[in-house]
């Protein structure tokens, strides 16, 4: 018996991926997906999410069907992100702007977003531009990520008017060298590196794979899409990265309406709030995003007495 794949129940109300994937329809659009169908203990067919190629094919179908993206590919060894959870961040950012601008979510290119660490997949600029028409500047310290993201943009007429990517030449900086004196951004966003070392990152990936599949021979294949070092880790881990981001953000206090970043570890929220108080942030918000049994969150801060678009 074929079963629709249930997507996490508590995605944002505007998330197009709430409910179930139509497995039959997905396989019709991408016949190769059918080779990754598996039978669960209940005798139902489902997709093998422990197979990286299955996730890649699923993303390609979803991006084409819902976000007008005809070409999307990532190099071997780079992060392959799940679409539903990534677009949730975009929708909650839209809510933040709606609250800021008197209840109306702003759409169009006048909303300018800076995505820190956009990656080879360019996923946040894709989802944000196609969901709300926002314009994006994506940055990354990895030349191949910038090159691949640029290829994705050039290969899709739907993306070219909305997205630019830029190499962050200084690997020790976040905003410095990217935000120019005359630049204004409505938002910055970031999915920061979580781990303090590549060893810890790979161990975390291995645990995740073990939960998805009992086939330990699958581990090497899955790690092909586990992510590069710059995507997964940095010295000091997430907390050090975000403290640096907060410190740097003060230098651009009048050029950005809202600085934001995902925060993977809830224990990091308190020290981040303390850091924001030290640098004089006028407004600080922690916004929770419930996705099934998992609760993620992002922190947002502004130095403007009354945050507004520029």
From Swiss-Prot:
One of its GO terms (biological process) is rRNA base methylation. Pfam families: Methyltransf_10. One of its GO terms (cellular component) is cytoplasm. Its EC number is 2.1.1.181. GO terms for molecular function: 23S rRNA (adenine(1618)-N(6))-methyltransferase activity. It catalyses: adenosine(1618) in 23S rRNA + S-adenosyl-L-methionine = N(6)-methyladenosine(1618) in 23S rRNA + S-adenosyl-L-homocysteine + H(+). It is an enzyme of class 2 (transferase). Keywords: Cytoplasm, Methyltransferase, rRNA processing, S-adenosyl-L-methionine, Transferase. It is found in: Cytoplasm. It comes from the Bacteria. The keyword Transferase applies. HAMAP family: 23SrRNA_methyltr_F (MF_01848). Belongs to the methyltransferase superfamily. METTL16/RlmF family. PANTHER family: RNA N6-ADENOSINE-METHYLTRANSFERASE METTL16, SAM-DEPENDENT METHYLTRANSFERASE. Specifically methylates the adenine in position 1618 of 23S rRNA. This is Ribosomal RNA large subunit methyltransferase F. The gene is rlmF.
């Amino acid at each position: 018996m074929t079963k629709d794949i249930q997507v996490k129940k508590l995605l944002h109300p505007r998330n197009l991926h709430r409910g179930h994937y139509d497995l039959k329809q997905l396989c019709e659009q991408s016949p190769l997906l059918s080779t990754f169908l598996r039978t669960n203990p209940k005798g139902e067919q489902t997709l093998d999410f422990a197979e990286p190629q299955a996730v890649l094919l699923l993303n390609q179908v979803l991006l084409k069907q819902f976000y007008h993206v005809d070409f999307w590919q990532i190099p071997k060894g780079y992060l392959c992100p799940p679409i539903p959870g990534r677009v949730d961040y975009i929708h909650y950012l839209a809510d933040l702007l709606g609250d800021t601008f008197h209840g109306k979510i702003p759409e169009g290119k006048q909303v300018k977003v800076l995505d820190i660490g956009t990656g080879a997949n360019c996923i946040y600029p894709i989802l944000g531009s196609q969901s709300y028409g926002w314009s994006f500047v994506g940055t990354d310290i990895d030349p191949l990520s910038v090159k691949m993201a640029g290829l994705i943009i050039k290969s899709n007429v739907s993306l070219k008017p909305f997205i630019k990517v830029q190499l962050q030449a200084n690997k020790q900086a976040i905003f410095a060298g990217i935000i120019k004196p005359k630049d204004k951004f409505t938002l910055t966003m970031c999915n920061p590196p979580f781990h303090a070392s590549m060893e810890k990152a790979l161990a975390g990936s291995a645990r995740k794979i073990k939960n998805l599949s009992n086939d330990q021979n699958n581990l090497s294949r899955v790690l092909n899409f586990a992510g590069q070092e710059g995507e997964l880790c940095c010295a000091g881990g997430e907390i050090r990265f975000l403290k640096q981001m907060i410190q740097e953000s003060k230098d651009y206090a009048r050029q950005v309406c809202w600085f934001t970043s995902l925060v993977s570890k809830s224990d990091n929220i308190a020290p981040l709030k303390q850091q924001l108080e030290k640098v004089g942030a006028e407004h600080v918000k922690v916004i929770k995003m419930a996705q099934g049994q998992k609760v993620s969150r992002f922190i947002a801060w502004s130095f403007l007495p009354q945050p507004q678009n520029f």
